[in-house]
């Protein structure tokens, strides 16, 4: 099995080239009455663009993975704000970056940590009573990992 280098996975995460779905603004969640914020997909796009920009800095050695994760967090807070889903996913994302930068986990383990957190929210989402309407950071990561976004 070919070894995957952590820097390649991190660069892939921060250099996400996925295109955002373009649903009608204010996508409804069906019977629950849930509606995504009108700017949600625009915010996902902004986070993706910033991730690409800082990913180049990581690749060039101008920024560490942890610094990039912290910068991306500040950006997502300014862009889409704080909410239970994004805050929770970011904590796992940051821990994965810290552990991988320290060399205590492999690239595969880092990816698995993030996927596990995302899957947890996919399972909780249908039962969540007070769903945040702009969980752009979470949906950016879900799309990048090839998973279904929360809507």
Cite the ranges covered by each PLM segment.
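C-terminal motif of bacterial Sec signal peptides marking the signal peptidase cleavage site
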Residues: 14-17
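Bacterial N-terminal signal peptides that target proteins for export
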Residues: 1-8
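Bacterial signal peptide processing site
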Residues: 19-21
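Short, solvent-exposed mixed-charge patches
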Residues: 149-151
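Post-signal peptide N-terminal segment of mature Sec-exported envelope proteins
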Residues: 25-54
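Mature extracellular/secreted ectodomains of secretory-pathway proteins
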Residues: 55-142
């Amino acid at each position: 099995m070919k070894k995957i280098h952590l820097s390649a996975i991190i660069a892939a995460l921060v250099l996400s080239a996925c295109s955002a779905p373009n649903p009608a603004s204010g996508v409804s969640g069906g019977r629950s009455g849930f509606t995504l914020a009108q700017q949600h997909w625009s915010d996902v796009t902004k986070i993706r663009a910033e991730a690409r920009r800082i990913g180049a800095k990581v690749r060039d050695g101008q920024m560490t993975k942890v610094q990039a994760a912290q910068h991306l967090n500040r950006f997502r807070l300014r862009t889409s704000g704080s909410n239970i889903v994004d805050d929770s996913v970011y904590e796992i994302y940051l821990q994965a970056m810290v552990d991988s930068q320290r060399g205590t986990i492999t690239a595969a383990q880092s990816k698995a940590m993030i996927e596990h957190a995302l899957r947890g929210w996919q399972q909780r989402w249908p039962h969540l009573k007070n769903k945040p309407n702009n969980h752009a950071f979470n949906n950016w990561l879900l799309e990048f990992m090839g998973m279904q976004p929360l809507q």
